[in-house]
Structure formats: C-alpha cells, structure tokens
Amino acid sequence: MANIKSAKKRAITSEKNRQHNASRRSMMRTYFKKVIVAIEAGDKEAAQQAFSVATPILDRYATKGLIHKNKAARHKSRIAAKIKAL
C-alpha cells in the first residue's frame, strides 16, 4: 500500500474507475451477445434490431476510450457482415 497521501487517494480513484469500466465493458458485451444469439438463431430481423441498439453503445465507449476505436470498427464490421450473410 502507498505511504504518500496523494498515492493513497489515487489508488482509491483507480479502483473506482476499474470497477466502473468493468461494469460498462460487461454491459457492452451483453448487448453484442444478444446480436450473436439472434444471428445463430437465424433471425435476421432480431439481429438487425439488436445490432442497431448495440452499435451506438460501442461507438460511445470507443469515444470515451473504454475500447480502441479500431476494435469498435472491427466488431461492427464483422457483425454487419454476419447479418448480411443471413
């Protein structure tokens, strides 16, 4: 554990941020799992609807730095291709 007061505060802040980011990352994954489930079921309409809900969330977290913008683009591209192939 840190001995300097500012380092102690920083450790507390870092832990809060880690938990907050973990929650957001989990939510993001959940939305994309819904899209994947719809694709695997072969339901194009449900997959498109779930994808339209998940896309802005992915973009938002890419903008905020939770994930890299290229990773967001890669996920969107791959999912869109899978939906198109249905």
Swiss-Prot record:
Role: Binds directly to 16S ribosomal RNA.
Extent of Basic residues compositional bias: 1-11
Disulphide connectivity of cysteines: none
HAMAP family for the chain: Ribosomal_bS20 (MF_00500)
Record-linked Pfam families: Ribosomal_S20p
Organism: Pseudoalteromonas translucida (strain TAC 125)
The protein's name: Small ribosomal subunit protein bS20
PANTHER family in UniProt: 30S RIBOSOMAL PROTEIN S20, SMALL RIBOSOMAL SUBUNIT PROTEIN BS20C
GO biological process: translation
Positions of the UniProt region annotated as Disordered: 1-26
InterPro entries: Ribosomal_bS20 (IPR002583), Ribosomal_bS20_sf (IPR036510)
GO terms, molecular function: small ribosomal subunit rRNA binding; structural constituent of ribosome
Source species taxonomy: Bacteria, Pseudomonadati, Pseudomonadota, Gammaproteobacteria, Alteromonadales
